[in-house]
């Protein structure tokens, strides 16, 4: 059995929203930047391909598909700001921590009129025998945590407006792969005839915020002092987020992910992307 990659330093589920303080960990006296990049790229085919394309991956076509994926990312309008990288990180975290299933391929989120789902950085589901829970993700891949909080709360408030939500549900429904095993259940949930009250009762928003952490840069291994200090940092940020959010109609799972520096992680991700493009 494959062990989890991410270290959950702190998990507080007795507050709203709940808190997950997540860390990539350390190895050989260094923050596990390179290991994180390798792990994220394990998810890249699943993140970028439709369900049907992913299911058809074979030893014969996988290299061609990887080239297709990397070309799609480079052509994305989000690439200049590395938005795709934050979305990939969110994808990996919620897949690992909550065993979510991706419902939509992010690379197929077009920016043209009538087919935009800019509002959601991830569209996943959690499936049980009786229910299908919709996970609509938001991520701010930032170096400044307080700027991240300010920007994400502005978007969260926009994304629960009725007209906005209905438009986004239409865009999502149009991109659900008919071969995906849960397609019918999700389309029924998002149908205009389904009350938004019922939809919202089965919907949560995972929010991922990254930031350059002064605590993280002080340590080169996981120790009691690091756990205590980073936990205090997580708790302080969580309180700031909660105070600014106020009352909110949907369940939120807040994921905080400290970085040594955002720029060095972005450079490593881009280098890996270029290597994959040359395969």
Predicted segments, located by residue:
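Active-site ExK catalytic segment of metal-dependent nucleases
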Residues: 133-159
């Amino acid at each position: 059995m494959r062990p989890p990659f991410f270290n959950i330093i702190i998990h507080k589920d007795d507050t709203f929203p709940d808190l997950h303080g997540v860390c990539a960990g350390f190895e050989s006296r260094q923050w596990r930047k390179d290991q994180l990049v390798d792990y994220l790229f394990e998810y890249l085919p699943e993140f970028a391909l439709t369900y049907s394309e992913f299911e058809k991956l074979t030893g014969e076509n996988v290299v061609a598909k990887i080239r297709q994926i990397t070309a799609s990312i480079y052509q994305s309008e989000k690439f200049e700001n590395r938005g795709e990288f934050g979305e990939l990180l969110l994808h990996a975290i919620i897949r690992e921590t909550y065993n979510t299933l991706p419902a939509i391929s992010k690379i197929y989120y077009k920016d043209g009129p009538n087919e935009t789902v800019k509002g959601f950085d991830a569209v996943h589901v959690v499936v049980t025998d009786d229910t299908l829970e919709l996970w609509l993700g938001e991520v701010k891949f930032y170096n400044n945590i307080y700027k991240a909080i300010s920007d994400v709360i502005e978007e969260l408030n926009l994304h629960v407006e009725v007209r906005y939500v209905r438009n986004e549900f239409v865009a999502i429904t149009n991109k659900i792969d008919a071969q995906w095993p849960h397609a019918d259940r999700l389309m029924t949930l998002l149908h205009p005839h389904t009350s938004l009250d019922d939809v919202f009762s089965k919907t949560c928003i995972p929010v991922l915020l990254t930031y350059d952490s002064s605590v993280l840069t002080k340590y080169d291994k996981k120790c009691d002092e690091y756990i205590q200090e980073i936990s205090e940092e997580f708790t302080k940020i969580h309180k700031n987020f909660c105070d600014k959010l106020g009352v909110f109609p949907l369940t939120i799972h807040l994921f905080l992910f400290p970085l040594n520096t955002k720029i060095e992680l972005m450079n490593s991700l881009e280098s890996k992307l270029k290597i994959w493009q040359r395969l």
